[in-house]
């Protein structure tokens, strides 16, 4: 059964942005929460799901299991281990983690150790040696929220990088499913063509027998030979396509094509789609979550820019020793210490702080627009694939009827040809129609599986519990 998307109201769309609502006042930045216009509501004829009617099963890590194909399951495991883009994005996550750790270090006092040895001379005196050892301590009191904003930006960037990794993983998984389905489709196309070859070879033998008996002309034999050779050429082409798709699978797995082989197997099952899908599951999409985190990071950077207009307040302390003689350096008489607050403020900077603040606000506006674009794109992708699944189901039913009719027509035409009431040209036409109908049905069924994979990708692997793993 094909799904329909439950009515996506103004509040459902705005809920995608709800997590950003409180960020405006957090660091002194005015909220610029991205909004999604109500005109983007989907499927006006869709039914509304009752509240609480759908339980959602978390199967993000193994959504391809809905195709019930053990070989595909094994390939997905290899993908998670060998796909090169995943390793690259994982490195980006580690980089963001290090950036967050660096930002968090600003919350703690900084302790240093200084040591020096110098020789100085005053006008009236003789040269003297000066030895010193000190341990200065400094700490910034985050009165204006600058350090907190830096930490919030680093945290949001870390989460965004993690969502980017999840998006790359999800995209790679979907690409593998699509390539695998195309490969298995090529195998089935090859099987159909092989069966057609056998039928055409029998027809050619029959035609040659009838030609030798003087019943038909040499033209009929030539037509039968052309029909057989054409099917053979098509099967070779399909075999080439299958090999190329196998190479594509190898590259996805991070393996050299020459080192990877995949035996022929069964076609993945078509997932059972639920009656309705809640649009709320779009909030789980990694691209939407990453875009929302980048809005938070940009908003935090506005807070950092605003804090620069206020003085930096902190405390500093210094404990050490100073002496002209090494033997007396660490004695009580050489002890020096200081403790007190500090404040620093930039009075004239040529408009630099204003420019930095304007830059941060522009970046926030851009992040908000990018977020809205990602949401709208997600809605379009889901709507397109839901509509495709619905239409492909109808198309598959109609094409199945066409295949049955083409087979009946071929049987009737062959019987008429044997009876001598029609020419072999009629048989050739009926054979071509039957083969075309069967190959078209395979193509539609393949597109159904691809549409299901796209829907799962659009929903980030979430599926109603009662229909997820039937």
Write out the residue ranges for each language-model feature:
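Glycine-rich cofactor-pocket loops
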Residues: 216-220, 376-387, 422-425
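Terminal intrinsically disordered/low-complexity segments used for targeting and assembly
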Residues: 2-81, 155, 239-283, 325, ...
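Small/polar-residue-enriched beta-strand and adjacent coil segments characteristic
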Residues: 25-26, 62, 68-71, 75-78, ...
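A short glycine-centered flexible hinge/capping loop motif at secondary-structure junctions
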Residues: 211-215, 417-421, 458-462
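Extracytoplasmic/secreted envelope proteins and their assembly/folding machinery
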Residues: 73-76, 90, 180, 225, ...
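Short terminal targeting/anchoring segments
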Residues: 217-219, 421-443
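Periplasmic alpha-helical coiled-coil/stalk elements that build and connect Gram-negative outer-membrane
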Residues: 147, 163-278, 388, 392, ...
